[in-house]
């Protein structure tokens, strides 16, 4: 029975396979891409063919090559932003969960206030402060504005764990916050962190795509899936459906696969259903 319960469904297997293929292909973009990401040619707005499997855009650039290189940027920013937001949420949520009630209310009140503000506006404001956009600045802007919901999940888990006998004993023996976090709290809320971290990767990629579509993402010379969609705004008017359809399918498919993987993590730990 347990083996059947833990067996991955076909949807999850397909998601893992898709993410593996996308990740490896993006990582090996310099080896797999038939052309440079910004290399122009005479074939303008050419439909998918033997020379250009995914077609070309209005500047004669190979779409397959740009998707491969764009995947590196989108996945990199998604992973970096998720790591930043997860780190902030772990510390913030743990402190809130272990603090006195009035401190906990104040910290969660601030998190709720931040959560009520449109993330995209805060990211744009931070980008204006950082100046020139780049992988690090975008990841920081998205990461420091995407931790609030995750912090509340972790806080709820910590409040539950803190009442256990072993945590109470560790506190009575003078155990530091860092020791209790490392030895007792982290193993207890790790499943919740894993679910939230996986979900935040997709959210960060979506935010980056939105910024790039608005022209507020990476510089023009850098390619991301969001910038590909931004460049394809006039594609349908010229009948070049592949310029918007193929990158859109790749981005949406990747986001769905990440969401399915996160859902599998949530289902794998039934205790998370009450807090998520």
Language model regions located:
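N-terminal signal-anchor/first transmembrane alpha helix
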Residues: 1-38, 189-190
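C-terminal transmembrane helix and the adjacent membrane-cytosol boundary/short C-terminal tail
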Residues: 134, 145, 191, 198-199, ...
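Generic hydrophobic transmembrane alpha-helix motif, especially the helices
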Residues: 53, 63, 97-98, 103-152, ...
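Non-cytoplasmic
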Residues: 121-124, 133, 193-227
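Short helix-to-coil transition segments within interhelical loops
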Residues: 56-61, 98-99, 169-179, 183-188, ...
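Transmembrane-helix boundary motif in ABC transporter permease subunits
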Residues: 29-32, 77-112, 124
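Membrane-cytosol interface at the C-terminal ends of specific transmembrane alpha-helices
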Residues: 82-83, 90, 94, 132-183, ...
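Start (N-cap) of specific transmembrane helices in multi-pass transporter permeases
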Residues: 66-77, 81, 116, 152-157, ...
């Amino acid at each position: 029975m347990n083996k059947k319960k833990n067996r991955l469904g076909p949807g999850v297997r397909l998601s893992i396979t898709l993410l593996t293929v996308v990740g490896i292909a993006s990582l090996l973009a310099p080896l797999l891409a038939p052309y440079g990401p910004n290399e122009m040619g005479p074939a303008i707005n050419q439909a998918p063919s033997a020379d250009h499997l995914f077609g070309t855009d209005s500047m004669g650039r190979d779409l397959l090559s740009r998707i491969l290189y764009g995947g590196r940027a989108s996945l990199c920013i998604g992973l970096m932003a998720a790591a930043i937001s997860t780190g902030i949420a772990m510390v913030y949520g743990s402190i809130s969960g272990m603090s006195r009630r009035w401190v906990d209310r104040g910290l969660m009140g601030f998190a709720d206030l931040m959560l009520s503000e449109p993330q995209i506006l805060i990211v744009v404001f931070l980008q204006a402060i950082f100046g020139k956009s780049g992988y690090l600045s975008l990841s920081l802007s998205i990461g420091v504005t995407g931790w609030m919901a995750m912090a509340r999940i972790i806080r709820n888990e910590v409040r539950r764990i803190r009442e256990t006998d072993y945590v109470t004993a560790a506190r009575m023996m003078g155990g530091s916050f860092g020791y209790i976090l490392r030895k007792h709290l982290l193993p207890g809320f790790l499943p919740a962190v894993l679910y939230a971290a996986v979900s935040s990767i997709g959210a960060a990629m979506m935010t980056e795509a939105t910024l790039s579509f608005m022209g507020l993402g990476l510089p023009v010379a850098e390619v991301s899936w969001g910038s590909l969609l931004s460049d394809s705004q006039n594609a349908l008017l010229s009948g070049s459906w592949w310029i918007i359809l193929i990158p859109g399918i790749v981005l949406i498919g990747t986001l769905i696969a990440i969401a399915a993987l996160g859902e599998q993590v949530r289902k794998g730990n039934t205790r998370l259903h009450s807090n998520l």
